[in-house]
């Protein structure tokens, strides 16, 4: 029989990785759109966003010695805020531009967890509460005809913990490093519509500190994981009451590539698989409210394409100020 604390302990690294992907987001979630980046010089602009989602997810985790499937699950919310400052905005004679900046992000996730414990299948047994503070840097190049390459580096500090409904748990701390490269190329049509294929690749390294509760040691093995995205964004450039606006709809295929990590309890390892695929749909709008202020946001729904009932829904809202 598996103790009710075990599912929470073994999915904490996976939730840490998910928080990192959410903090990185996509270029359009952070910046709105290419047409909003129209300032130059030193400290040309600042931006910020709020994001959040409610999600349900299940992983495959096996106790290696016995080939027992714990099947840990989580149901809860992930939220965050992010603020960035462009340090340099360089507009070139050929119409292209480069933008370099720094950002801070705070991300949290909390909810209930369960699994195959106490002789029962998918039994809800406890709760998890995690928080991450992140700092990062970005460089974005936008070509004269609107294509872009966006790259990010980010370092995060994690703290929080998980506990069972019987009041036994352990605190969690650690760190992660993440890098992301994203690109998109717009195809423009005479009626003002734009179709933009996109691709993104994210790498993370997660390193959580070892811990213990009153019964066992909890040893976290550090691990690296890749996440990829292929997307298509449809947008229209128009005006509403003389305000330039850009409604959009997008579809993304997200994939966590084959990777696993170990959490050991008194030297008994539990191996969790991270590979999974999901389909995400987004709708939203960007608007340049004035010469100096722009707003943007969207709604999102995603569903897993593998076995299980993974799904999420959420949103993103942002503000950009040109100094």
Identify what each model region corresponds to.
Residues 5, 10-11, 40-323:
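Membrane translocator/pore-forming domains, dominated by Gram-negative outer-membrane beta-barrels
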Residues 2-44:
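Outer-membrane beta-barrel biogenesis signature
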